[in-house]
């Protein structure tokens, strides 16, 4: 009897660890204004959830998309994603801070952000028609010790947040910002990488004219990309950030180059991407009509610890084995 109850307790705690361990973007701060993301631990269970800029998903287990699904629409904005009803205004050159609920420190990997022009209202866009341009990317920062310091570690150190600068030269219009962490803690195994894509709607303003050519979401990665199938538990002389090349018009942020490596002497390698004009033929795009989010939606952001199991043990049980849980 006692051993049965200990096993049951262990199972419940393991489930709680899995649910609470992975994160999602719960809040977005744009030029000082806060907007709610899609609260996947709450909204799916409400009969009338609020309209937000974040895309809805069915990933209530806070799970991931693996490489077997790279040609599936789920890789675009997560499981069964549908567009957010609202868009948040941001000026070209402005910043977007994406605040995650949490992120496990064992889940090392790159942080990548893309923009895709909706060419209309993002609330009704067909996600499979979106072409994504990489505007921000950071991967391996320091390989002094295995498994190294990664962009995900910087995100954790920044209170589980990541700031993306909207390129100054991008043409105005309605865009989807696709923001993603790729966890590589199991990536030495085939299909072991874990993608956690998050999408929000933006209405970009400004006088830019650049309309760079993008890549469909289902073509961003392959299971054998060197930055996807990789063993981070050995010293890496090179790490190639997955996906298309960083756009030349991306903001002048310090990022890990898509082709640069941490040096053999274990000195952190950080390159600054220079601001340059897009090589694509520029065109002026006027924003289509959209529903703009104007209010701060703070009341819908719940506590991170939204799932806390309650376990009652009526018998006195002596446990001599330490039970540990692992976040997968």
UniProtKB/Swiss-Prot annotation:
Disulfide bonds join 77-199, 118-122. Glycans are attached at residues 80, 121, 159, 235, 237-238, 245. The keyword S-adenosyl-L-methionine does not apply. This is AA9 family lytic polysaccharide monooxygenase A. It holds the Pfam family AA9. It is found in: Secreted. Gene3D superfamilies: 2.70.50.70. GO terms for cellular component: extracellular region. Cu(2+) binds at residues 22, 107, 196. The gene is lpmo1. It is an enzyme of class 1 (oxidoreductase). CDD domains: LPMO_AA9. Binds 1 copper ion per subunit. The modification Methylhistidine is found at residue 22.
């Amino acid at each position: 009897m006692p051993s049965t109850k200990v096993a049951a307790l262990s199972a419940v705690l393991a489930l709680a660890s899995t649910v609470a361990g992975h994160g999602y973007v719960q809040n977005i701060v744009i030029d000082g204004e806060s907007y709610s993301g899609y609260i996947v631990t709450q909204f799916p269970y409400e009969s009338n959830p609020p309209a937000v800029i974040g895309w809805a998903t069915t990933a209530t287990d806070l799970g991931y998309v693996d490489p077997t699904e790279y040609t599936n629409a789920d890789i675009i904005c997560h499981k069964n994603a549908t567009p957010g009803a609202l868009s948040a205004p941001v000026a070209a050159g402005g910043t977007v801070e994406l605040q995650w609920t949490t992120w496990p420190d064992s889940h090392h990997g790159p942080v990548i952000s893309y923009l895709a022009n909706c060419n209309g209202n993002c609330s009704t866009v067909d996600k499979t028609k979106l072409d994504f341009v990489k505007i921000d990317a950071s991967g391996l920062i320091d390989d002094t010790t295995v498994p190294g310091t990664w962009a995900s570690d910087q995100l954790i150190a920044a209170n589980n947040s990541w700031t993306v600068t909207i390129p100054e030269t991008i043409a105005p219009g309605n865009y989807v910002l696709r923001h993603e962490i790729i966890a590589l803690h199991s990536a030495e195994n085939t299909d072991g990488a874990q993608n956690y894509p998050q999408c929000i709607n933006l209405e970009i303003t400004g006088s830019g004219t650049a309309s760079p050519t993008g890549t469909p979401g289902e073509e961003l990665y392959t299971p054998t990309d060197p930055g996807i199938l990789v063993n981070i538990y050995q010293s890496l002389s090179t790490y190639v950030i997955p996906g298309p090349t960083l756009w030349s018009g991306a903001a002048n942020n310090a990022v890990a180059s898509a082709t640069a490596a941490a040096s053999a002497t274990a000195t952190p390698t950080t390159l600054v991407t220079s601001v340059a004009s897009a090589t694509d033929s520029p065109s002026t795009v006027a924003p289509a009509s959209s529903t703009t989010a104007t209010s701060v939606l703070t009341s819908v952001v719940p506590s991170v610890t939204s799932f806390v199991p309650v376990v009652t043990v009526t018998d006195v049980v002596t446990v001599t084995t330490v039970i540990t849980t692992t976040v997968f």
